[in-house]
C-alpha cells in the first residue's frame, strides 16, 4: 500500500465513529474488500490487535454473520455438535452422496483425517473390516512418505492387506498371523501365548492411534463379520436377543456401550481387548449408514472411540439417539 493511500485512509482514525460503525467498516474491508488486518489497521490508524478484536466483537454481536454456501455447511454444523456432545478429539462428517460406495468415501475421509493426526514414524493400529482397509489403501502414500508403522489390532486382517499393496517395501507392517476368531477359548489361549501373536498384540497396545470399523446387528447378512464366516446368522440373532447392537473387533456391545456378557465368541477372539483399545490416545471409528446408528452411538457412549468419521444421514441419526 502506498504512503499516499495510507495517508488518505488514515483520516478515518480521527472520526468520531461509534463502535458499531467502526465494526461495520472493519468488517467491510476485511470480508468484502479482502484486505488483511494489517492493511485495515493502516487505513484506520489502529493497531492490528484492535482490528482483530473488532472483528471478533462483530461476530459475537451479530453485526457480522458468516454464511457458508456449500454442500458441506450442514456437515460442519454436525461435526461441531458431535464433537461437543461426545467430547471427540477428531470428527469428520461427509455429505450424503450415492455416487461412490460408502466404504470408499469413508475410507478417503478417514485417511485425510489421520494425515492431520499422525507424526512421522508413529505407530498406527488397524482393525478388522473393509472400511478400515479402504482407509489404509488411501493412506498408503502418506504411510510410505512419513514412514508410519502399521500393526493390526486383531486377527483376520490378512485377506484385506491386498488393499495396501502400494506401501513401500521399507514400511513396517506387523500382523497377527491368525484369524479373527478361532474354534475355542482353549485354542485362543494357546495362540495368544505364541510369540508371533503375543508380540503383535503387545505392540498394538502401544500404538499412537487406531482406526476401527463398527459393525451392526441391523446389517443382517451384510455384516462383514458374518460374510467373513466368523459368526453365523443364528449367532447374530442370538447376540441381538441378548442386547447386542453392534461390534468392534468382534466384541459385541449393548446399547450402553458395554460388552455383552456370556458370549463364547469373546473368549475365542485373537487381538487386543476393548479395555486395551480404549487406553490408546486416539481411536477413530469409521462407519456409516443409518442401520449403524445404534452401534455407533453405543461405541461413543462406551467411550470406545474418541474420533469418528461418518456421513451426514448417519450423524443425524446418532444425534437423534443421543437426544
Curated annotation (Swiss-Prot):
Keywords: Cytoplasm, DNA-binding, Repressor, Transcription, Transcription regulation. The keyword Transcription regulation applies. It is found in: Cytoplasm. Residues 37-60 bind DNA. One of its GO terms (molecular function) is carbohydrate binding. Transcriptional regulator that represses the expression of the lsr operon in the absence of the quorum-sensing signaling molecule autoinducer 2 (AI-2). It also represses the expression of the lsrRK operon. Acts by binding to the intergenic region between the lsr operon and lsrR. In the presence of phosphorylated autoinducer-2 (phospho-AI-2), LsrR is inactivated, leading to the transcription of the genes. NCBIfam families: PRK15418.1. This is Transcriptional regulator LsrR. It comes from Enterobacter sp. (strain 638).
